[in-house]
A protein has these predicted regions:
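Peripheral peptide segments
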Residues: 1-134
Length: 134
């Protein structure tokens, strides 16, 4: 079973909203549209909240993985991976739509990871999503 993990984003609404709506940046919105279109289970990865269900209501916040102490990052990553394993014990592949810092922290604790956007800058990532919408 494949599960998609989507990066959170720095740009957010200024009021509480479901995780699927609170992030307003173009890259995060494109990744969410892609995840929905696949019909596969998907979650948002947040430095503050860990593995976030798209329906979970979040308050606006301003925390990224760069804000987490380096010694805490493996603990955070184990928590994210552990929650994923509880929710989807049959998950055999994670399709990661994450920034490099998040992926570097998480990869050792996840099932095999596919990174379809590896090496792509923001513009190329947006194009990748746009090509899959048409």
């Amino acid at each position: 079973m494949r599960v998609l993990l989507i990066a959170c984003g720095a740009t957010k609404l200024d009021h509480p909203a479901p995780a699927s709506e609170i992030y307003t940046g173009s890259l995060t919105r494109a990744a969410i549209r892609h995840a929905i279109a696949t019909g596969l289970p998907w979650y948002i990865v947040s430095a503050m909240h860990g593995l976030v269900d798209p329906a979970q209501v979040l308050e606006p916040y301003n925390v990224s993985i760069a804000d987490l102490d380096r010694d805490y990052r493996p603990i955070w990553a184990r928590q994210v991976a552990g929650r994923l394993a509880l929710l989807h014990p049959a998950c055999s592949v994670v399709e990661a739509h994450l920034g490099e810092s998040y992926l570097r922290a998480l990869r050792p604790f996840l099932p095999p990871v596919e990174d379809p956007l590896q090496g792509l800058g923001i513009g190329h990532r947006l194009r990748w999503y746009a090509e899959r919408r048409s």
